Amino acid sequence: MAKLLKLTPTSNDSYVELKNIDNEYLNFPVHVFPKVIRDVINGLEKTSNFPAGATSASLLFLVSTIIGNKRKVFLKDTWIDGCSLWFAVVGKRGTMKTHAVDYMLRPINTKEIQFAENYEAEVRVFEAYTDEQKKEYFNETGNYEPVRKQMLVKNSTREGLEWLMYQNKTGIGMYKDELFGLFEETKNYSAKGVMEFYLDIFNGKIIIVNRRQAKPFTVENPFMSVLGSIQPEKMMIIASQYTDNGVVDRFLYVPTTDETPKFTLDDIPDVYKDSYTFFIDKMFHKFNNAKPAELTFSTESKQVVLARMGAFEDYKNSDDTSEAMSNYISKIITYFIRFTIIFNEMNDRGMVIQPESVDEAFHLCAYFIATGERTFAGFEAQSGLETICQRANAKTKSEMIKAIIKKIPNINTKTLMQFTGATKGLISQIKKV
């Protein structure tokens, strides 16, 4: 049984030990959020069957996108980071994950409509300017023409993302309903360059763009949070083709239930709609015109960070931790510090990271370690099934099913369906023989 970080009740513990996984850690820790958000997420799950993991990940994605480059955190001279977050919501079709994400992104979609209307109005005014007025416009804004403000992008090429980040200095959020397409981008045309591009964005490295028929430009502080959904069968493909891809272990995995909820006519109560809209509007107004600034850690918070880092390191270096999970923990540590920005800002705790923000970040990391264990264990299982089929020279669906059942008689039908792509009927037929 895999291990998990044991959560301690106070912030002053000098050591955090490891313990066995408990199912509670595979439920999204909604308790880390401010009460207004807890009530919204729990209410949406109860009234609309929206998975708490999907709504929570969507909220975190949205908050990180709103904050963007306006906040970084200073831990030490060699560790200054922002709050970009990459989420993969894993679930079958029809499990409400897409509906949950779409609902939580409504506020930003409303903003995008406003941005588009404002841009069109600015263009109409600009086009009526004289040459002298256009010069004055440049002197005042630094732009040769109006720039469309944008926070959310759904479909874009690498070139498009570079230009969007250049125009929108605060950063952007990318939502992909089918996240598998992003992994495909890192495999196809100019794959190496695309993969390095995404890794540079994740790490906030400067991007210098030089193209033959365009003026060069530089994105000094690239920022992009990512949210997408992916089906379990696509995860199987990722396990077989992308485990050496540096992009895979940058994602935080959010599993949702395989059960398809019963349809009801229950609507989302206005209290949840109003509370959520008010919270997001408040965050947006706070950061829309805010100047970039660095948060710092209080003396007490630094001690809590030190204790939690010790727990991560013990887990990472344990003989029971797989190589894949050991590598993944390094990324979790990165997210640990990024989460402190999110929680400090959501709770209006000022410009100094408070111990409560560190503990909330740690609780969230415990969840993602648990889901990471499950995800990477699935990758390892996938590799094992491939080895069985290769050794048996099994190529057709029937041959693969027979080879696997011979080696693993008790393997469940669901796993066989996901791995081979066979129907439940074919598998049952072969099992009876």
PLM regions with names:
Residues 2-433:
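Phosphate-handling catalytic cores of nucleic-acid transaction enzymes
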